[in-house]
Amino acid sequence: VFDKSEDAIAYIKAQNTFPTVIKAEGLALGKGVIIAENLEDAIAGVHEIMDDKVFGDAGNRVVIEEFLTGPEVSVLAFTDGKTIKPMVSAQDHKRAYDHDKGPNTGGMGTFSPSRVYTANDDLARICDRLIFEPTIDAMRREGRPFKGVLYFGLMITKNGPKVIEYNS
């Protein structure tokens, strides 16, 4: 997480791994992500978010993340702060153009349940055991128990499910 564009750019240069993901840390209506294919695009992306404020105050800080490939799956879950009960999965289509191309939008369409999530009987159990329950447990241990509906944005990679974002 970076507060200054020059620090974010220095980190990107040191990593020298592309594509790389640059996210506005704040809420940007599902649009605060830039996937940079090269250093030039990454530098421009950091400046757009942090200096030009294309996402407003959401871009006061940026998160630089590893680029993951695979289908995205959304899971909403009810929690009382101790137990968690996932609802049915969904799959969004966020990109503006066909074939997952173009800038992210607030959402071009969604279907439920996600075929990716339901096609593998073990995936829901893996997410429960390795993502959902540990998230609730960690929040409680940190003195921030959460009660309500929690959103898990997941990427199903060749190495298993990875969390790309949480929302409440």
List PLM regions with ranges.
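A conserved helix-loop-beta module that forms one wall/lid of the active-site cleft
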Residues: 1-32
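Internal nucleotide-binding/catalytic subdomain
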Residues: 32-168
